[in-house]
Amino acid sequence: MARTDPSSTGSNGISAFLVDATLDGIRVGDPPKMLGNEGSHACYVWFENCEVPADSIVGGQEGRGLKAALRGINHARLHVAATCVGQAIRLITEMTEYASKREQFGKRIGEFGQIAAMLADSQAEMAAGRALCLDCAKQFDAGDQIPFIDIASAKLFCSEMVSRVADRAVQVMGGLGYMEDLSDVPRLFRDVRLFRIFEGASQVQQGNIARSMMKDLSLIHISEPTRLSA
């Protein structure tokens, strides 16, 4: 994105471009080593006196790039929230299978109260996050103008939830949950850390939610439950 109208302010005058990486003046760096999510690459891109053709404007209309991006951010944040739920299900499955098989002092470790609490809390929090995602998805499918606060709440809760679940999975599985050669849990533990950062960090979501609440008290609501057909 670039401001194509220097006299404009705010989101006005910012245009989005789809740029050919082979143009003169573009330099693409090597992907940096990341903590997790190694299947998703990111890299630095430098633009030095690069001339971008006018027909590279996304949507063909100048000055609407940031507005278009903001319109799509709700979908992106719901996608992240749903991904968090999926990762949580995987982690819960891993630690529950382990707790059901690993025995200490003559019984399965999942029967010990503290381990059982971690399993139960993880399941309950995952189910709550899934309900948030389904409620938002239902509104999207119905073509409703979904409240910004609903998406922000789903993104905030689910990203924080999956981090707690990942931490519990390592704790339940003990040394096995810390050894990459023996379990996928260490990789998942690293991967889910990103969800609290990208598409709006948790602190950004908290600020957005609080501002929305104070601006319009009617946003503090409980959506109608999804009715399943018989």
Q: Could you say what each language-model-derived stretch is?
A:
Residues Y44-W46, G60, R64, R71-L219, ...:
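Alpha-helical interface subdomain recognition
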Residues N12, S40-A42, R190:
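Short, solvent-exposed loop/turn segments at the edges of secondary structure
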Residues M1, A16-L18, A42-N49, L194:
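Conserved hydrophobic/aromatic beta-strand scaffold that supports enzyme active sites
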Residues M1-V28:
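A short core secondary-structure module
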Residues T22-E51:
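Flexible, small-/acidic-enriched active-site or ligand-binding loops
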Residues I222-A230:
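A short, hydrophobic C-terminal helix/tail in secreted or cell-surface proteins
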Residues S7-S11, L35-G39, Q61-E62:
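Solvent-exposed alpha-helices and their adjacent loops that cap or buttress functional pockets
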